C-alpha cells in the first residue's frame, strides 16, 4: 500500500512539474499576462507571417479574416461573421456583462507595393501587393491582446466582456465607418487600438477628417482636328474642375488638405474624350468643415460641367471623422506602454536595421526603438476610419516600433520589417500594452467613469452622428476597380 501511495505521489509531483498550472492560473496579474504572451510569440509570429504572405486587399481579406476568427474561436470567443454587410468583417466576444472593452484589428494590404524580407530593395516576382502598413501585425497583436484579456477574465472570475472587432479595408475602404453605422459600437464602453510605426508612443492627439469621391465627366467624342466643334471634351470638364478647385485653396481654412489624381482622360490626342474621371480627397481637422469644403468642390465640378457642355456624376468613395482624443484614457495606455518597454534588437536584427537605415533619410535614430516617446499632444495629418469609432465610444491608441526608426508607412522598408522578427517584437509590445490596459479598465470602475465623462464633455451634448460617406453601401469591389 505504501509503495502504491509513493508511486501516486511521485506521479503527482511529475505532473506538477510538466504542467505546473493551467493557463488561467498564470494570468491573474500583468506579469502573468506578459509571460503568457511571450510564450505565444512563436505561434503569433506564424499567424502574422501567414497574413503577410497572403497580402489580401481591402474587402478581399477572406483568408486573413478567417485565420484570425478561427484563432479567437479556438480560445473560447463566439464569432459573428459578415457583420455590417461586409463578408470580411466580424465581431468576436468573450465574457458577459459590462464593462465591454473592444479591441480593433486590421488585416488589409496595399496594392502596388511589395518587398521580400530583406534589407535591400527586392520585390517579390509576380506579387503586386504587400503589407506596407503592418496590418498583418495589427490584426494579430489585437487578437492576442483580446485573448490575453479573456484569460484574465477567466482566471479572476471578473465580470466583463472583451470584444475583438475584425475591421477590413482601412486603406481607403472606410470599413469601420460601415460598422459604426450598423451600430456595432453602441454598447461598447471603451475601445483600444494601435498601429505599427517606427516608434513607441501613446501621446494624445488627433488627425484629419476626410471625404473622398470619384467625379466622372461625360461628353461627346469627335475628331479633334476635323470636327472639333462637334465634340464636348470630358477631359475639359475635369481640367476646369481642377482649375477651380486649385483657386479654392486660397479660400479655405489653413488646415485644409485637397488632393486629386486624374484616373481617366482619354486614349489619343486626336479623339476628343467622351469620358474622363478625377479622384478627390478633402481633409480638415473638423468633420463638419470637411463636409462643407467637399460641397464646394462638388459645386466646382458642377460649374465645370456646365461650362464645358458635359455632365458629371459624383460617387462618394469614403469618408471618416477625425479622431476624438480622451486624455485620461491615453494616459492609462501610456503608463502601460511604459511598463512594457520598447523593442530590443538582437545581433541579426541590428545588422538588418543598420542596412535599412542606410536607405532612409532623416528621422529617429537607431536605438530609439528601445525608448517610449514623451507624452505630449500630437496633431496628425493623415486620416483613418477609426476616427468614427472614437466619436461613438472612448478610444485609446498607441503605436509601437515594428519598423526600423526613420521608416515611413507605405514603403518597401516597412514591408520588409513587417515580415520579420523586428515587426513581431513590436507586435508583442502592442499586445501586452493593450492587454494591460484592458485589465485596468475591467478592474477600476472609477477610472472608467472618469474616461466616460471626459469623452462626453469633449464630444458635446448636441452631437449627432452623420457619417461623411452618407448612406452608400460598402464598396466591396473598390480595389478591383482601382479605388482607394
Residue ranges and their predicted role:
Residues 51, 92, 103, 135, ...:
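Divalent metal-coordination and catalytic microenvironments
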Residues 27-131, 136, 140-161:
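Acidic/His- and Gly-rich active-site-bordering loop/insert found
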Residues 1-5:
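N-terminal secretory signal peptides that target proteins for export/translocation
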Amino acid at each position: 500500500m505504501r509503495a502504491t501511495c509513493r508511486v501516486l505521489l511521485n506521479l503527482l509531483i511529475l505532473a506538477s512539474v510538466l504542467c505546473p498550472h493551467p493557463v488561467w492560473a498564470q494570468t491573474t496579474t500583468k506579469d502573468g499576462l506578459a509571460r503568457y504572451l511571450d510564450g505565444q510569440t512563436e505561434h503569433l509570429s506564424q499567424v502574422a507571417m501567414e497574413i503577410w504572405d497572403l497580402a489580401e486587399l481591402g474587402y478581399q481579406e477572406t483568408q486573413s479574416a478567417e485565420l484570425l476568427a478561427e484563432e479567437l474561436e479556438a480560445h473560447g470567443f463566439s464569432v459573428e461573421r459578415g457583420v455590417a454587410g461586409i463578408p470580411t468583417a466580424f465581431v468576436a466576444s468573450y465574457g458577459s456583462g459590462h464593462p465591454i472593452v473592444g479591441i480593433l484589428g486590421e488585416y488589409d494590404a496595399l496594392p502596388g507595393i511589395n518587398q521580400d524580407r530583406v534589407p535591400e530593395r527586392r520585390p517579390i516576382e509576380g506579387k503586386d501587393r504587400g503589407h506596407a502598413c503592418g496590418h498583418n501585425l495589427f490584426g494579430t497583436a489585437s487578437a492576442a491582446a483580446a485573448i490575453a484579456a479573456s484569460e484574465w477574465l477567466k482566471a479572476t472570475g471578473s465580470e466583463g466582456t472583451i470584444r475583438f472587432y475584425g475591421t477590413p479595408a482601412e486603406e481607403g475602404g472606410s470599413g469601420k465607418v460601415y460598422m459604426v453605422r450598423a451600430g456595432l459600437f453602441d454598447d461598447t464602453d471603451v475601445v483600444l487600438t494601435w498601429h505599427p510605426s517606427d516608434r513607441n508612443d501613446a501621446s494624445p492627439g488627433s488627425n484629419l477628417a476626410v471625404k473622398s469621391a470619384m467625379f466622372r465627366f461625360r461628353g461627346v467624342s469627335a475628331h479633334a482636328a476635323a470636327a472639333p466643334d462637334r465634340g464636348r471634351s470630358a477631359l475639359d470638364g475635369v481640367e476646369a474642375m481642377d482649375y477651380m478647385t486649385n483657386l479654392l485653396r486660397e479660400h479655405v481654412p489653413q488646415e485644409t488638405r485637397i488632393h486629386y489624381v486624374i484616373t481617366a482622360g482619354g486614349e489619343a490626342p486626336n479623339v476628343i474624350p467622351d469620358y474622363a474621371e478625377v479622384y478627390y480627397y478633402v481633409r480638415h481637422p473638423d468633420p463638419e468643415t470637411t463636409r462643407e469644403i467637399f460641397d464646394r468642390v462638388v459645386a466646382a465640378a458642377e460649374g465645370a460641367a456646365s461650362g464645358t457642355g458635359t455632365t458629371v456624376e459624383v460617387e462618394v468613395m469614403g469618408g471618416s471623422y477625425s479622431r476624438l482624443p480622451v486624455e485620461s484614457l491615453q494616459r492609462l495606455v501610456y503608463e502601460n506602454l511604459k511598463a512594457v518597454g520598447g523593442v530590443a534588437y538582437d545581433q541579426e536584427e541590428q545588422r538588418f536595421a543598420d542596412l535599412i537605415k542606410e536607405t532612409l533619410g532623416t528621422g529617429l535614430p537607431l536605438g530609439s526603438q528601445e525608448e517610449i516617446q514623451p507624452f505630449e499632444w500630437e496633431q496628425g495629418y493623415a486620416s483613418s476610419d477609426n476616427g468614427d469609432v472614437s466619436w461613438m465610444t472612448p478610444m485609446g491608441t498607441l503605436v509601437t516600433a515594428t519598423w526600423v526608426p526613420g521608416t515611413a508607412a507605405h514603403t518597401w522598408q516597412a514591408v520588409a520589417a513587417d515580415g520579420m522578427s523586428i515587426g513581431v517584437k513590436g507586435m508583442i509590445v502592442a499586445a501586452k500594452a493593450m492587454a494591460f490596459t484592458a485589465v485596468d479598465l475591467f478592474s477600476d470602475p472609477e477610472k472608467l467613469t472618469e474616461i466616460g465623462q471626459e469623452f462626453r464633455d469633449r464630444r458635446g451634448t448636441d452631437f449627432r452622428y452623420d457619417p461623411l460617406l452618407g448612406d452608400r453601401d460598402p464598396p466591396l469591389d473598390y480595389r478591383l476597380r482601382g479605388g482607394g
